[in-house]
């Protein structure tokens, strides 16, 4: 999940290929199948699964996000008037505590925030996949990194086992790069954009290659059906040519030519417009098993927050139609039920909310749209707000199922309502079963 989407407007265009890619193999349990002008689907068991990806993100677990687990960060609070002294990300969390204390607190968090029962619940609720974010620092670090390292991998392995036990599939998502790929707090290091600096790129590539080699091995392919090369690279501020040529293409070559794996790779769209990636790593150029991951929110810009409900629905449906003619198989790997940015720290520590006019980020401010009071208390929600939230969720599900499916952000939080699938389901704001529709055909589609 991100917080600075108003920056995202620039487009770059480039096309390049590597020599002699490994040819596509026959369809198997890790190949995508498609027919012209039809939705692509995942072939889990040497036959069509018959449904799109319907997944949840395991957010705030192996990569900290203050709004998901605020108690970890509230421990640093020194006054009630502002967030001064509270670390803004995992980098500073570990730096402030020192390695030993950070390790103790993080191990406690990793051991308790998710349990196998959560994965059993996810499966029983009809989901078929979990996307698990993890940072580069779990596998490799820079010399001066304060991160706790080397321990997250065992928790990831445990989670993959939980998924297997409950017939869930997994995307392993490299969520944070050395130097940060986007400057968001969820990259591990806020306000930095140095991912493509040579030493940072080398460490990130080392971590990625480890992930690719391990989780593309035969023992994992029954469960791990995709590896995301990097989450949300901020294309408008990065050198896209360098990212493609020095990171994405080498990753593909390493996967196909060095370790000779037919694992699926996931590429985030880098906040580029639909069809931007249509001439990069395409089937016609000999590439295969490449998926584009789009992320969609409507709460990180004041104009979006001011939209009418019909406008929100229209935009959501356009997210679905926008990918119908994209060259790659596509999934919406992040979206949410949220229609406000009221959840504390969802915009990052210290920034406030645009919705109630408390947003301050340098010279940027916002004007009042509505109150954020009691935002996480469902008893304070009007019937209209509940209806709007359910409408918005259903429209997004229908839109994303026009192609490969969806993975909602995220399964649970400590206290948020708008960002917590468990709470949304409990309060009837997220469909159960997942195909149930109180507001059918909002995108002129039919419910399955």
Curated annotation (Swiss-Prot):
Offer one example of a GO biological process linked to this entry.
Answer: glucan catabolic process
Reaction catalyzed: Successive hydrolysis of beta-D-glucose units from the non-reducing ends of (1->3)-beta-D-glucans, releasing alpha-glucose
Q: Name one GO molecular function term.
A: glucan exo-1,3-beta-glucosidase activity
Superkingdom of this protein's organism: Eukaryota
Q: What is its main location?
A: secreted
Q: Which SUPFAM superfamilies match?
A: (Trans)glycosidases (SSF51445)
Question: Which Pfam family, any one, appears in the UniProt record?
Answer: Cellulase
Q: Which GO terms describe its cellular component?
A: cell surface; extracellular region
Query: Per its record, how is this protein called by name?
Result: Glucan 1,3-beta-glucosidase
Instruction: Alphabetically list the UniProt keywords.
Output: Cell wall biogenesis/degradation, Disulfide bond, Glycosidase, Hydrolase, Secreted, Signal, Zymogen
Q: What does this protein do?
A: Beta-glucanases participate in the metabolism of beta-glucan, the main structural component of the cell wall. It could also function biosynthetically as a transglycosylase.
Query: Which organism's genome codes for this protein?
Result: Saccharomyces uvarum (strain ATCC 76518 / CBS 7001 / CLIB 283 / NBRC 10550 / MCYC 623 / NCYC 2669 / NRRL Y-11845) (Yeast)
Localization of this protein: Secreted
Q: Cite the propeptide residues by number.
A: 20-40
Disulfide linkages recorded for this protein, renumbered to the chain, are 317-443, 342-372
What Enzyme Commission number(s) apply to this enzyme? 3.2.1.58
Q: Which residues form the active site?
A: 232, 334
The signal peptide annotation in the UniProt record is: 1-19
Q: Which family does it belong to?
A: Belongs to the glycosyl hydrolase 5 (cellulase A) family.
Q: Which residues cross the membrane?
A: none
Q: Give the lineage.
A: Eukaryota, Fungi, Dikarya, Ascomycota, Saccharomycotina
């Amino acid at each position: 999940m991100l917080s600075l989407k108003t920056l995202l407007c620039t487009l770059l265009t480039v096309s390049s290929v590597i020599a002699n890619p490994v040819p596509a193999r026959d369809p198997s349990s890790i190949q995508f199948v498609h027919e012209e002008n039809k939705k692509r689907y995942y072939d889990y068991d040497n036959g069509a699964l018959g449904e799109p990806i319907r997944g949840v993100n395991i957010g705030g677990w192996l990569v900290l996000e203050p709004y998901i687990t605020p108690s970890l960060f509230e421990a640093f609070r020194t006054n009630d008037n502002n967030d001064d002294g509270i670390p803004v990300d995992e980098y500073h969390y570990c730096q402030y505590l020192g390695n030993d204390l950070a390790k103790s607190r993080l191990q406690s968090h990793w051991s308790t925030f998710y349990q196998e029962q959560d994965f059993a619940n996810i499966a029983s609720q009809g989901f078929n996949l979990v996307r698990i974010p993890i940072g580069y620092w779990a596998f490799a670090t820079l010399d001066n990194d304060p991160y706790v390292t080397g321990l997250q991998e065992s928790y990831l392995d445990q989670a993959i086992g939980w998924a297997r036990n409950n017939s869930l599939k997994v995307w392993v998502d490299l969520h944070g790069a050395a130097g940060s790929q986007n400057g968001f707090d969820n990259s591990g290091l806020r306000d930095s954009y140095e991912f493509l600096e040579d030493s940072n790129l080398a460490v990130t590539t080392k971590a990625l290659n480890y992930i690719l080699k391990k989780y593309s091995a035969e023992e994992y392919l029954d469960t791990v059906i995709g590896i995301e090369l990097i989450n949300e690279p901020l294309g408008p501020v990065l050198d896209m040519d360098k990212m493609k040529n020095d990171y994405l293409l080498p990753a593909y070559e390493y996967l196909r030519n060095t370790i000779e794996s037919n694992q699926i790779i996931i590429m985030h769209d880098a906040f580029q417009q639909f069809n931007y990636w249509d001439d990069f790593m395409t089937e016609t150029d000999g590439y295969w098993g490449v998926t584009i991951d789009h992320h969609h929110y409507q709460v990180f810009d004041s104009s979006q927050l001011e939209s009418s409900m019909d406008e929100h629905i229209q935009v959501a449906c356009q997210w679905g139609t926008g990918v119908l003619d994209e060259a790659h198989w596509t999934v919406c790997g992040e979206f949410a039920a949220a229609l406000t940015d009221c959840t504390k720290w969802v915009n990052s520590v210290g920034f406030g909310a645009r919705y109630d006019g408390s947003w301050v980020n340098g010279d940027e401010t916002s004007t009042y749209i509505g109150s954020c009071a009691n935002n996480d208390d469902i008893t304070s929600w009007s019937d209209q707000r509940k209806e709007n939230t359910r409408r918005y969720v259903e429209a997004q599900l229908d839109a994303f199922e026009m192609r490969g499916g969806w993975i909602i952000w995220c399964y649970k939080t400590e206290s948020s309502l708008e960002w917590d699938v468990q709470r949304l389901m409990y309060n009837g704001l997220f469909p159960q079963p997942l195909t149930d529709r109180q507001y059918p055909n909002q995108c002129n589609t039919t419910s399955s």
